């Protein structure tokens, strides 16, 4: 049997499917997720149910968002899971997660995410950060390194700044390729994202921060002065106490927020 076939389902490349098969890893992830009935539990991309089964067993109801129609049908006909699941067939990138919120219950979101959509999906989920208690995701190890990076490192970038603006980022465990069927060509890791109840550095307009980061990191090798000359003047950099000769990866989240807030003040 092809390594791409697992439990009778052929992994689809266009959906970035790699199915988790290592019981030890599965148990550790479920332990980190800590399923309970005090939150709305939401899984993105349940696939063949490696995480779905142990999580659903521990709670009354699990909401899942799955794009692949064949996998949705399997879940709908699953002898154990079908009565425990609320299934949304569709693209998580377009999904309105706020519709899942119940009064008095925040979301706990988790998933073994398709690596080809993981970064845009992170940005999409940050829009719902206020409704989310915790997020646990299996990602390409390189993406987890980017999420948790410190200023001055190669991995530090736009994703880092936005993730750390919204959430505390905690790497949980590394997962080797042989834990999946078919094995991916890259190492994987699980990350915990804890959205802040109160952000350490509040921004007046998060869209301005997002745009500023995109502009700053567009040309990583150039200085802030070069990249942001249309946005901030020499005097404004001086006022903020930020060295405009630094490169974008050398600037902290707090400093990016300070720059964005200055841009907001100018637009007011």
Curated annotation (Swiss-Prot):
SMART domains: rADc (SM00650)
GO cellular component: cytosol
Keyword Mitochondrion: no
Enzyme class label: transferase
Main localisation: cytoplasm
Gene3D superfamilies in UniProt: Ribosomal RNA adenine dimethylase-like, domain 2 (1.10.8.100), Vaccinia Virus protein VP39 (3.40.50.150)
Keyword hit for rRNA-binding: no
Compartments it resides in: Cytoplasm
Single GO biological process annotation from the record: rRNA methylation
Disulfide partners: none
UniProt GO molecular function: 16S rRNA (adenine(1518)-N(6)/adenine(1519)-N(6))-dimethyltransferase activity; RNA binding; rRNA (adenine-N6,N6-)-dimethyltransferase activity
SUPFAM superfamilies in UniProt: S-adenosyl-L-methionine-dependent methyltransferases (SSF53335)
Database matches in InterPro entries: KsgA/Erm, rRNA_Ade_diMease-like_C, rRNA_Ade_Mease_Trfase_CS, rRNA_Ade_methylase_Trfase_N, rRNA_adenine_dimethylase, SAM-dependent_MTases_sf
EC number: 2.1.1.182
Pfam families: RrnaAD
Binding site for S-adenosyl-L-methionine: 18, 20, 45, 66, 91, 112
UniProt record similarity statement: Belongs to the class I-like SAM-binding methyltransferase superfamily. rRNA adenine N(6)-methyltransferase family. RsmA subfamily.
Function summary: Specifically dimethylates two adjacent adenosines (A1518 and A1519) in the loop of a conserved hairpin near the 3'-end of 16S rRNA in the 30S particle. May play a critical role in biogenesis of 30S subunits.
Protein name as annotated: Ribosomal RNA small subunit methyltransferase A
Organism: Shewanella oneidensis (strain ATCC 700550 / JCM 31522 / CIP 106686 / LMG 19005 / NCIMB 14063 / MR-1)
Gene expressing this chain: rsmA
């Amino acid at each position: 049997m092809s390594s791409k076939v697992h439990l009778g389902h052929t992994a689809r490349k266009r959906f970035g499917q790699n199915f988790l098969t290592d019981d030890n890893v599965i148990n550790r992830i479920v332990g980190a997720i800590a399923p309970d009935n005090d939150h709305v539990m939401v899984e993105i991309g349940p696939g063949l149910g490696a995480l779905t089964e142990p999580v659903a067993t521990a709670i009354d109801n699990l909401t899942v968002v799955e794009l692949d129609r064949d996998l949705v049908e399997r879940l709908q006909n699953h002898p154990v899971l079908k009565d425990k699941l609320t299934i949304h067939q569709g693209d998580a990138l377009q999904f309105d997660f706020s519709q899942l919120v119940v009064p008095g219950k925040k979301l706990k979101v988790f998933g073994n995410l398709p690596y080809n959509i993981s970064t845009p999906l992170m940005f999409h989920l940050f829009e719902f950060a206020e409704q989310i208690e915790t997020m646990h995701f299996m990602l390409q190890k390189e993406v987890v390194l980017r999420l948790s990076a410190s200023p001055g490192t190669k991995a530090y970038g736009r994703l880092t700044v936005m993730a750390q603006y919204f959430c505390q980022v905690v790497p949980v465990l590394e997962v080797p390729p042989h834990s999946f069927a078919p094995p991916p060509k890259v190492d994987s890791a699980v990350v915990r994202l804890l959205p802040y109840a109160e952000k350490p550095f509040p921004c007046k307009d998060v869209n301005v921060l997002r745009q500023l980061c995109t502009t700053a990191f567009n040309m990583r090798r150039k200085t802030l002065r070069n990249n942001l000359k249309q946005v901030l003047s020499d005097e404004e950099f001086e006022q903020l106490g930020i060295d405009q000769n630094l490169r974008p990866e050398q600037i902290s989240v707090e400093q990016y927020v300070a720059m964005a807030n200055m841009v907001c003040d100018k637009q007011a």
